[in-house]
Amino acid sequence: IIYSDKTYDEVKAAFVASPLPSSLKSKLRSFLEIITKPLAVRSSGLFEDSLGQPFAGVYSTYLIPNNHPDFERRVEELENAVRLVWSSIYTDSSKAYFNAIDSMIEEEKMAVIVQEVIGNEYNGKYYPNISGVAQSFNFYPFSYIKPEDGFAVIALGLGAYVVGGEKTHRFCPRYPKLQLASIQDMARDSQKHFYAIDMTNAEYDLVRDGEQAAMKSYDLK
């Protein structure tokens, strides 16, 4: 697969058509018998623990509502999400990144993590009140903030909004009231929409529509 001339769509189709081990299928079924909230299916690769190179966003993460009335359909959706995360090692962007950092893609080993999405459902939309990222070192401190005080970036809704580089609220956790921007600037550059899992659409297609299949953008009004 690594050095073949197959397109990623062909590789993805091969993964989706491949059966999962019976032991894994059994565990996924048992998991779904207990967990009924939306799920995040994401990667946990060896290279993602690398101290030398960032790997955030290189592989795919799939969000699924996990609310289809047919239990077998829920199982199928979860199994496909697992396959698709595994296959995301071989996307064009992943291969290009491995080449850019001069690493061997065949050295990667990946587990897949299945976990509940933190949040609540509001009018058919499932999302957390706050999501964000925090860093322990601030390269652009101001006033009496020190670099080691770090900073955080937060937004309403799913974390895809934050990691996608959209308009967010940035602050220092040690001095949360200290703001560099004026009130006018904050109002102009504030969040205008958010991402949530669409709980009203039970007929989404992960294979066809990718990571965005079950996620929608909603305006803030």
Where are these regions (language model features)?
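Extended, well-ordered alpha-helical scaffold/bundle regions in very large, multi-domain proteins
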Residues: 1-13
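Conserved mixed alpha/beta core segments that line enzyme active sites in large multi-domain catalysts
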Residues: 15-221
